[in-house]
Amino acid sequence: MLNLLLLSLSVCLLYVFITAFWNLYIHPLHHIPGPRQWIAFPILRHLSAIRGTLDSDLRRWHFRYGSAVRFGPDEASFITAEAWKDIYGSTRPQLPRVISSGSNTSDIINANDANHARYRKALAHAFSTNGVRDQEPLVIDYIVKLVGRLKEVAESKLPTDMVKWYKLTTFDMIGDLAFGEHFGGLEKSEYHHWVATVGRFTRIIPFLKIMDAYPVLFKVFLAVMPQSFWKAQAEQAEYTKLTVQKRLNSSIAQDRPDFMDSMLRHRNEKDKLSEHELESNASVLVLAGSETPADLLSGVTYWLLKTPEALEKATGEVRSLMKAESEITFSSVEARLPYLLACVNEGLRLYPSLPGELQRMSPDTPMKISGYDIPPRTRVSVHQYAAYSSPTNFHDPDRFIPERWLPEAKTNPSSPYLFDNREVFQPFSVGPRGCIGKSLAYPLMRTIIARVLWNFDFDLCEESRSWHIQKTFGLWEKPPLICKLTQRKQS
């Protein structure tokens, strides 16, 4: 018996050794540099993801190895503008998304190309120029509610968590646009159970990616998962189903300028969305359209407070050019507040809403990405956090410098930011699967920041001085951003 165990152990060790040797020295991807331990033993890459350090590790690997990094046997990450075009562009047939077997393929993020085109067509009106214009009054109503609640906080003179206020606002707002009713977060000053479940679920994302690579390990993980998590997931799904059904049966179903109205415009066509697809897409729109803007709003607020000169310029611009709060609208912010727009871009650069990679699978034939030969069936991606913080792409990359986005920085020969690689900055991705919500997200975020700065002076509390040091689990794991607010004294 002992001999059999020793033989089995020896065979396992030999297999591990041979596999590691193959991955390091023979594998067709061996010409791309990267951390040798991760390449030899891919479980280390997954452990990094489970710990929440994968994105900061990849940032470090790119700083060490350059514009292309191999971080697993068949995984490569890039940080060049060319890689965006090669991986996500529309000049060749789309590279398929890499998704885990547990992903919901009935939504616009994880769908195959054919269904993605259907979903995008169904949502096209919602994110068109006319659609965004029609949604603006509803968005402004929620921003007014946020400002009203923050005025109460300022009057109390107590510190407050801006991450929470931004999340309550964006989830109420996008929930209303997707489901036809809000979550009541701003009214109650607390997260609805649907929203709270999202926060708990993000930590599970790395485990889902283990499912296909290490199915036995994943079964162990499932066995130790608390039943309360699965109960919360079921309650979230049931809430989505009931709320969508309520919206479909409502008398305003065809007259309300929201996401569901857009999806229902094609209900009599042969490629209409099923009720399950309506539920899936409404749910993912709430998640993507709420969590990521809240990230950006929190990030911009933090970096402005950490950079007093930028805060002074942005606040001065808003208050000098906007004579009344009601003047702060989608169009006026874009047309009249160039420095604020630069602050939003710089916030997205230092704190991208999706810090990690959107992986694609290379085809069954070799291809080139950013000049590198890539063998078939390789998982490839641009890593946003690493790309935006690389000194090869941006001058002084670790500092919050909105001036780099102003027009003169791109044309003035004496500007230190003249050669910043702005084409690598693609926070909403590119190509046919680029984020459809960009047309709403940008004006929404800019208008919230502008109205908050118009109304309040901020101080960053000591406990949030290092707020930007965070773990990531697909999304940022945001700690509270504790600030003191003072209502602006108007002359």
UniProtKB/Swiss-Prot annotation:
Keywords: Heme, Iron, Membrane, Metal-binding, Monooxygenase, Oxidoreductase, Transmembrane, Transmembrane helix. Heme binds at C435. It is found in: Membrane. InterPro entries: Cyt_P450 (IPR001128), Cyt_P450_CS (IPR017972), Cyt_P450_E_grp-I (IPR002401), Cyt_P450_sf (IPR036396), Cytochrome_P450_monoxygenase (IPR050121). CDD domains: CYP60B-like. Gene3D superfamilies: Cytochrome P450 (1.10.630.10). Its EC number is 1.-.-.-. Pathway: Secondary metabolite biosynthesis; terpenoid biosynthesis. The chain crosses the membrane at residues 5-27. Its cofactor is heme. One of its GO terms (cellular component) is membrane. GO terms for molecular function: heme binding; iron ion binding; monooxygenase activity; oxidoreductase activity, acting on paired donors, with incorporation or reduction of molecular oxygen. It comes from the Eukaryota. Disruption phenotype: Abolishes the production of 15-deoxyoxalicine B and accumulates decaturin A. It is a single-pass membrane protein. It is an enzyme of class 1 (oxidoreductase). GO terms for biological process: mycotoxin biosynthetic process; terpenoid biosynthetic process. Its main location: membrane. Cytochrome P450 monooxygenase; part of the gene cluster that mediates the biosynthesis of 15-deoxyoxalicine B. The first step of the pathway is the synthesis of nicotinyl-CoA from nicotinic acid by the nicotinic acid-CoA ligase olcI. Nicotinyl-CoA is then a substrate of polyketide synthase olcA to produce 4-hydroxy-6-(3-pyridinyl)-2H-pyran-2-one (HPPO) which is further prenylated by the polyprenyl transferase olcH to yield geranylgeranyl-HPPO. Geranylgeranyl pyrophosphate is provided by the cluster-specific geranylgeranyl pyrophosphate synthase olcC. PANTHER family: CYTOCHROME P450, P450, PUTATIVE (EUROFUNG)-RELATED. The 15-deoxyoxalicine B cluster is a rare cluster that contains its own geranylgeranyl pyrophosphate synthase (olcC), in contrast to other related clusters which rely on a FPP/GGPP synthase localized outside of the cluster. Belongs to the cytochrome P450 family. This is Cytochrome P450 monooxygenase olcB. It comes from Penicillium canescens.
